[in-house]
Amino acid sequence: MMVFQSFILGNLVSLCMKIINSVVVVGLYYGFLTTFSIGPSYLFLLRARVMDEGEEGTEKKVSATTGFIAGQLMMFISIYYAPLHLALGRPHTITVLALPYLLFHFFWNNHKHFFDYGSTTRNEMRNLRIQCVFLNNLIFQLFNHFILPSSMLARLVNIYMFRCNNKMLFVTSSFVGWLIGHILFMKWVGLVLVWIQQNHSIRSNRSNVLIRSNKYKFLVSELRNSMARIFSILLFITCVYYLGRIPSPILTKKLKGTSETEERGGTKQDQEVSTEEAPFPSLFSEEREDLDQIDEIDEIRVNAKEQINKDDEFHIRTYYNYNKISENIDGNKENSNLEFLKIKKKEDSVLWFEKPLVTLIFDYKRWNRPNRYIKNDQIENAVRNEMSQYFFSACQSDGKDRISFSYPRNLSTFSEMIQKKIPSFRREKNPSDQFSTCWSLINEEKKENLKKEFLNRIEALDKEWSVEHILEKTTRFCHNETKKEYLPKIYDPFLHGISRGRTQRLFPFQIITKTYLKNPIGGSWINKIHGILLNINYQKFEQTIEKFNRKSSAIKKNLSFFSDPQEEKYKSEEESKIFKFLFDVVIADSNDQTLIKNFMDFHEIHKKVPRWSYKLRSDLEELEGENEETIPLEEPGIRARKAKRVVIFTDTEPHNEIYTNLKNNKNYDQNDEMVLIRYSQQSDFRREIIQGSMRPQRRKTVIWEFFQANMHSPLFFDRIDKFFFFSFDIRGLTKQILRNFMRKNEKKKLDKKDAERSKRKEKGRLKIAEVWDSFFFAQILRGFLLVTQSILRKYILLPLLIIIKNSVRMLLFQIPEWSEDLKDWKREMHVKCTYNRVPLSETEFPRNWLTDGIQIKILFPFYLKPWHKSKFHSSQKGRLKKTKDKGKKKDFCFLTVWGMETELPFGSAHKQPSFFGPISKELKKKMKKYKTKSFQVLRFFKERDKIFLKGAKEIKNWIMKNFVFIKGKRNDLSKGNRIPLLGLREIDELTETKNDSITSNPIIHELSVQNRSMEWKNSSFSENKIKNSIDRINTIRNQIEAISKEKKKITNSCNKPPYDSKIIESSKKKWQIVKSKNTRLIRKTFYFVKFCIEQLSLGIFGGIINIPRIITQLLFESTKQIRDKSIYKNEETQEKINKKKNTIYLISTIKKFKSNKKKISYDLCSLSQAYVFYKLSQLQVSNFSKLRAVLEYNICVTSLFVKNQIKDFFQEHGIFHYKLKEKTFLNSESNQWKNWLRSHYQYNLPEIVWARLVTEKWKNKINQDSLVLNQSLNKEDSYEKNQFDNYKKLNSFEADSLLNPKQNLKKDYIYNLFCYNSINSKETIFDMPLDIIIDNFLVSSFRGKSNIRGIGKFRTRKFLDWRILTFWFIKKVNIESAVDTTSKKKNIQTQAQNSERIHKITKTGLANQKKDFFDWMGMNEEILNYPIANFDFLFFPEFVLFSSTYKIKPWVIPIKLLLFNFNEKKTVNKKITRNQNVFIPSNETKNLRFYNLTKESADQGELESDNEKQRNPELALPNQEKNIEENYAESKIKKPENKKQYKPNTEVELDLFLTRYSRFQLRWNFFLNTKILNNIKIYCLLVRLKNPNEIAISSIERAEMNLDLLMIEKNFTFAKLMKKGILIIEPLRLSVKNDGQLIIYRTIGISLVHKNNHQISQREKKKIEKAITKYKKKTVNRKKKNSDFFAPENLLSPKRRREFRILICSKFKTKSTRYRNSRFDKNIQNCGQVLNQKKDLDKDKTNLMKLKFFLWPNFRLEDLACMNRYWFNTNNGNHFSMIRIHMYTRLKINS
């Protein structure tokens, strides 16, 4: 029951998965998604829903809905139907259909009778309104959707259309899905409208609110009535929107097209993508087909710069003589070619009227200009993007049509051409099932026939028949069976290898000289098939025949149609008939019976690629000036980013060597310019768009600001800075608040404010610059204004100010400063700069400065000063302040349009130092001094006033005392003479009481006296005192009554002094001072006026008297300067003489110091070394032995502390050794312990001593482990050289397979491991630290079995360190001779010697070798011993250990294909000279090496071809075999040739660098960009100046020029640059077009047999035959079933052998088996059986024998390609899944 339930659940899940993945469901899903792609058609649909009411309204709704659905149905049909898709997808559909209809509809809607919606009595079908509504919705639905664009949806639909089989079902289901979505959407819209109409609250409340005010009274009614107007406005917006998208045919400039060429023509101006074909492909040979299949990589030919005359167009095209009538085998004559020509003319005449209409309406080239231009780097013309990178075609495999991704391109092109020309060639497609059954039957029949044939041959072998009956013969092309006459082997399509001859080609950088074309060009054989297929012009062909007779030398290429034929005679008439059938002879020579070596070029089959018919160039190319030679000067067609050409430096004096080599070149420009391209800061809105072309809107870009730095999509809205209203990032806000709350340091806030302020300034500056850039004539206007402002400032304004200033000084009786001002004025320089601020010179204007712009930089700007300070009065404090502000001060500025000065162009004007500022400062100082003096006088008078007041006070006190005495006396008198009256007594009493009150309060009386005394002006204090005393008695008497009344009111407040008493006292003092000053001033005015008059007269007469004194002083100074210059020159010459005498200046200063008797304190801290060594130099040299030993062996110590001058001196005198000089150690920072070890010299043993210490056992182990590695070091890439040594060692592979069965079994295991482990290989980083000592590193790499040779330690580094590549495979030339001399000996000896030589490459030798510009890539030394697997085995590390094993049998794996290291050896023929226009630098010792194909090993096939040569010795070519053997010997003994060397040219070095090492990118380190650019700008100015010393010194003082970045060393290598951090080199993975096919090519290259490696020389073949015959004699008496013959399948030919393998391992009738590919998860039909490998092979001897018979180990890898092609029934490059086959099926023979 449980099983049943699980079964039901599994079925349900599978059923659900099938339903979900079905075509119908997916189509419904995609169709439902397209509902949301809202377009302008919804406007009319909603308009009909909203506005129309009544019967006519319902009819309009129905018509709108039907039109809408019909339009969408057309769109869905266009997905499936290609013509409709092309018609609707073109942008011109909008032009033709949309815009006129939209405009008509818009103006029709605005008609006055448009709103008349009354019912009509006409027939409904005749009602135009309903039809217009239908047409509106139909046409609008065809337009592109714009509110919610569905580009991604369309791509998904296209992808699924490609995948699914039932496409029509998918289209219909998607339409149904759209219909469902549309119905739901419209129902939702209808419900919303009904809800709005029925909802009373919305209608009443909102309307009441609006109606309350009179202003909005009729708004609702107006809105309801003007719905049609709103829709018409929306329609107008769509019209304007589409206006921007249409390609307007008006006002477009027609492009200048390239020359009209034929569809398959071959001129170099055609610039088509052509597939390079083999010279004569043998379509009948399967092996040849495999190689052709791989070799068909796109070779793109761009020869736009080589314009060829029309007379020389014959050299690529294949020609046919139409005048001569062809002759068939039957002898019938026909004029077939002329018939083809007539048919072609008829077709052209029929189509003449169709072309203008199509190009007018639906031209994809947009009348005159295309829609968009996508530039291809390798093709000058614009190839349209319909061209695919890879080629695939349908082919029949396993009886069914399948897509082959490696289909031969030329084969498909050839079949297309044949089908066009010959209608009968077209095949009718049979049903797939019928064809598959027929195919399986044919294969079964083939298999049975091959079985029988194979069994018969084995039986013949058992019966010991002759070899002719056993081995299969090679098929030959025979034309007479009775006479057994065959075609010559050169032309036999069934043959291959050496019998087909060789192809000679000229390599790059070479041309054909006159000696090469010495032989007359005779008759040529031309293929008749090419003549049938290609269109040939008679007149051109006749001209070519005449050129052959004139011995024309216009052939640029030497690709001959046939490959080096031998001179042979025709033997019979039948042979000539067959040749006449295949070929026609152009008789241009009397010797028509011979074949000449040199032939005319053949036509390569071309494929017409979709491309534009014109040639355009971009703005950038115009700025770079690359295409000036080829294209006439016209405006660039492609718009690029705004850029300007900045000329940094123009070299008017080129190098003499280069100039003499290039003087014959007419296009050579003597003014070599260094140019930078400066891009604008604004956004790139016009990238790669052709000028005048249409602008398809970019849906993904939105413009946010007026000046936007970078364009970006709204998808990145969350990453940009937004307003607070748009920002919803709460987490970021909280972070920012907390950060601001926690931040305590206010300095950071200030820095941030400064940075923000500088950013704002920079943005403002850029805005101004972009405004100047945006207008057309703005730069011209600005340039003229700047130049006029510069002239006005320099020559008018500043001299005028100087004159005014000095004249005013003369009027003020001061000394004029003419010389100082003129000196400062002359120092000011107006340097003309480029728009990018690169300074040129004062007189030189930048190129195109009116259009590109100009900047004027003012160096040492002149500021008018009221006076000049003397230099001697500057104090130490002033000096310190000056040095502190030196870096901040800038002695330059830029001129603005208004004549102001700015620090940067387009910046804000900074304030100039004012002229009156120092004057006001000086006046303030003088006023301060005057004030201090006046205050001193006042202080003196104040002290005097104090003394005077003190005396007056003492007088007052004396008077008061006297007054009290007199008063007492008077009282006494009054007491003595009393009058007896009552009144008087009472008065006395009152006076007594009053006196008591006066004594108690004396201050009041004094104040009253003081107040009264202030009123009295001209009276003294003493006189008033007496009067006051008398009057007081009277007043007291008068006031007795008042005092008695007020006595009660008196309080304690009367006792306090009043507040104003102190103020009155101070004012009194001031008044007295002022009064005294006035009197003094009146007295001294006369003397002051007299003093002023005297000073004026003295100033005038003093200035007149001082004029001759100033003149004499100037003369004295000029003579002193001249005298100082002469003294300085004498000192310089004396210094040069002293340098020649090798004197030490430090020691001479000590001598001067001793001789000088004056007591002057010198600082001898810097002279301590010199003093010590001076004392040592006075001693004898013999006493230096100990010191020399110490200093020599402690180099690390002495070189760091001893000065260079002292070391140079002692080195020249022989006192010290030269090693005392300073050394640059490798990585001294990280290797300090190594430097310490170097200082301990007793442990630094020489290499010979180290070699003795190594034990023999360890050495042998190293040599055994490094056997594989040293084979590659023996002779690089020479397959032939190793063959002899390997055959001598192993006695050939056949004998070895017979004699050493155990070793062969071990090899089989290695082969299996080689195949299976490559799948599970892990990626490893190719990296090695530079710090490891190379001797130990190499030894450890040889001892340990690392994955990649030369790698011991792995470090986590992201890029490949190129420095490690120079330590191993680059050797010196002195090692080369030793390797070449030992190459004659046995292989084992060379291995041992080479391994020792590897250990002898030391680190110091590499560090001290001479380095040049391209030394880091190894371009200066010849690569002698290049390891084979150095680069390609990075992908397959496990292949390294087995590479030598495969190299022993080079026919198994083509190492040249897999391990191609791009180092080909160049052998130069005597008859071929190098092109004189190309120079290779002297440092590069020709490591671009090309193989000479004539010296490769001859291609003879396998062992059967050798046996065939024994049977048919007349077929062999002994002369060629001798040449091959001689080439073997030459390649071994050959030494490098001394070639002519040229001096390096910068352009050639750059070209070599880019072509060979284009995968490396050089970039500056980011923090050095500004420094280096600033240095470059200063260099540009200094180069142009005659006396650059002053400006150089000032720029160094201002820290503008960095001396650390100066290239002081001449030979500055990349290693040092990288150490300093100036350059960083990172590998850049470029997407090269051929890379994908090269990877496939190399993957299959493992499994392909390279024919050059099949060749066995005659000597080795004899040895193999001897070994086989000896072994046969030994095994005669053995049983036949245990016969140990190496491989029975070798009885068959190679082609039949592979066919037999595949047929025997396949069952063609069973179709049920399936192979599931786990990598791509696809079900691929499989017809092969997979047998598991048995584990007990070693136990069972019979199984072992069967394995040896039928495993075929020497052809194991060859079968891998066949497995992919035949067993998996696919050709799609999934080459790693084929290694899943563990074992081949065994051959089952039924006895």
Curated annotation (Swiss-Prot):
Belongs to the TIC214 family. One of its GO terms (cellular component) is chloroplast inner membrane. The chain crosses the membrane at residues 19-39, 68-88, 91-111, 133-153, 176-196, 230-250. PANTHER family: PROTEIN TIC 214, PROTEIN TIC 214-RELATED. Residues 257-271 have a biased composition (Basic and acidic residues). It is a multi-pass membrane protein. Residues 257-278, 1498-1521 are annotated as: Disordered. It comes from Aethionema grandiflorum (Persian stone-cress). Its main location: plastid. Keywords: Chloroplast, Membrane, Plastid, Plastid inner membrane, Protein transport, Transmembrane, Transmembrane helix, Transport. It is found in: Plastid, Chloroplast inner membrane. Involved in protein precursor import into chloroplasts. May be part of an intermediate translocation complex acting as a protein-conducting channel at the inner envelope. This is Protein TIC 214.
